[in-house]
UniProtKB/Swiss-Prot annotation:
This is Homoserine kinase. It comes from Staphylococcus aureus (strain MSSA476). It is found in: Cytoplasm. Its main location: cytoplasm. It comes from the Bacteria. Gene3D superfamilies: 3.30.230.10, GHMP kinase, C-terminal domain. Its EC number is 2.7.1.39. Keywords: Amino-acid biosynthesis, ATP-binding, Cytoplasm, Kinase, Nucleotide-binding, Threonine biosynthesis, Transferase. PROSITE patterns: GHMP_KINASES_ATP.
Amino acid sequence: MSNVLELTIPASTANLGVGFDSIGMALDKFLHLSVKETSGTKWEYIFHDDASKQLPTDETNFIYHVAQQVASKYSVDLPNLCIEMRSDIPLARGLGSSASALVGAIYIANYFGDIQLSKHEVLQLATEIEGHPDNVAPTIYGGLIAGYYNDVSKETSVAHIDIPDVDVIVTIPTYELKTEASRRALPQKLTHSEAVKSSAISNTMICALAQHNYELAGKLMQQDGFHEPYRQHLIAEFDEVKTIAIQHNAYATVISGAGPTILIFSRKENSGELVRSLNSQVVSCHSELVDINISGVKERIVYQ
């Protein structure tokens, strides 16, 4: 029997307000993949959660598509594979489910195609496919990361930031919000003065995080001009959640990725009460505390 590739891939939250398409943080919600060769004539899928059961099992499957794309790039052929999947990352909720699947697909192609990619090369590939590093970088490395993708040179640069000493709360609506729909809400252009203002806010926010000044960082996270003003109307619960967070003296309330999940940076002494208040008052969502993931994707080979 063939060896089994086991992958544990974290979720991620992107933007942190003003860090649009650049800043991301890994979270302890996971996509679990167990992959082995099959004697069948096509790829097989075994889904262990209800959300994953909605995914296609033909060649339009995202993991299949990306894995074959990577294999083609390196001129290798992949065997037919059986993928067992279990995920507690909700789909189309702004928690990086597609980035987790993308990273998983690259690892699958790397192992079964014997490509021998370094982690740096995994990052470059993932960002080239995704178009920006805000989700894939923390998914690969863990922690809080700022990154930039040069679409001319096809080079990704990343910098790690200290893990914030805060409690993180995610408020997850029951409905999906596709990234494509959320991006359609954005303006095509910003004026020079608008771009300078948002860039200055983002720069200062990063420095505040690096200095562990969460009061200032949180204040600046909520002054975004790149995307939040254009997306908040798509999330009916945003204003109510932010009001409750303010009542509990939270540092910041922002959209997680493209939404609709709402991310809160909470003071540790207030986080439990805040989560309970959110769950009792905002009944159309589920709120929970989630740890910041520091390890990134984990790979394990089970020899059979």
